[in-house]
């Protein structure tokens, strides 16, 4: 399967994406990660107001194959979580880069985005 990643996305080694959305950062998991997981049946996300730290687990996604932790690509405070994905995990399955986003955070250090892979580098990584 060929994957397409938006140019403005930045990616962590653990397959989470992040991108600046005004002064906030939107976080999700890549289409590649969703494909590897298979049918997603459950998503667990922290409450709004929770602080997350870059590289630390912030929730999990459960599929028919496995339960995988998700890791924060940047540090910050959760200002919004996608409750639609919690109620209907298939939204993550069907549109991970759009309606299937997971969190919006107020970043502690927006420069952390620059430490993540750009779309081209991430595409090469998953193709290797």
Curated annotation (Swiss-Prot):
GO terms for biological process: glycine decarboxylation via glycine cleavage system. Binds 1 lipoyl cofactor covalently. The keyword rRNA processing does not apply. Its cofactor is (R)-lipoate. Pfam families: GCV_H. InterPro entries: 2-oxoA_DH_lipoyl-BS, Biotin_lipoyl, GCV_H, GCV_H/Fam206, GCV_H_sub, Single_hybrid_motif. One of its GO terms (cellular component) is cytosol. It comes from Prochlorococcus marinus (strain NATL2A). Belongs to the GcvH family. The glycine cleavage system is composed of four proteins: P, T, L and H. Residues 24-106 form the Lipoyl-binding domain. The modification N6-lipoyllysine is found at residue 65. The keyword Transferase does not apply. Keywords: Lipoyl. This is Glycine cleavage system H protein. NCBIfam families: gcvH, PRK01202.1.
